[in-house]
Amino acid sequence: MQQPEAANSLNAIELAVLDAPVLTRGALSMFLLHLADAGAFDPVWSDQIHVEWTRDLQRLRPEIPAERLRQRRAELERAFPVANVIASRDAQDEVLAHCTTQAERKSAHVLATALSARASVIVSDTSFCLAEVMSKVWHDIAVLSPDDWCMELLDRQQASVLAGCQAHRAAWAGGDRSIDAWIAWLRAPHAGLTRTADQLDSFRDQL
């Protein structure tokens, strides 16, 4: 039988930094934030992460007005008012001390934000280049893809994930609101949650 402390640690709400490549993908990030709103995890970001995702989205989608991007950031801040973290000088110095390339120094703020927030996870994509730096910084922080993070959450916070999925599906703007269409949407490139979609397919009666 599990001791209460062990059970509580398994079900504790984790903090996860959402990196700019994740926030740039609006469909994906909105799905993740529905899970967060349902209590599956607490999101973390920083002013610099906001600057990066808005800049990247302007480059990828120049037709989107700058005012719309400002509104999106304001909506994120209103929905999660304690998510924005200012990286401490000590954390920044610790990370930068182990950076040897310009790419590492450019991304150092993401790890410094995670350290300052005491986050357990950084959710990013394959562009994240601090694996070697992280091996030298003695902190237990995982770097996961959005799909891997959702799979972890399904294992640890199943009820909250399913509640978040229900809320996302209810708010989903897709024309066909069937469960099959929604799961196909998760698998499609704009979300890219193929393993998560496969796993959620077994919970379709709860979605």
Describe each PLM feature range.
Residues 1-30:
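Metal-dependent nucleic-acid phosphoesterase active-site entry motif
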Residues 15, 26-63:
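PIN/NYN-family metal-dependent endoribonuclease catalytic core
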Residues 22, 92-106, 127-131:
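Acidic, metal-coordinating catalytic cores used for nucleic-acid/nucleotide bond scission
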Residues 107-142:
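Acidic, metal-binding active-site segment of PIN/NYN-like and related structure-specific nucleases
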Residues 28, 106-107:
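Amphipathic coiled-coil/heptad-repeat helices and related helical stalk/stem segments
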Residues 76-100:
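Acidic catalytic patch
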Residues 128-207:
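Acidic, PIN/NYN-like endoribonuclease modules and their adjacent C-terminal/linker elements
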Residues 67-77:
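Glycine/small-residue-rich phosphate/adenosyl-binding loop
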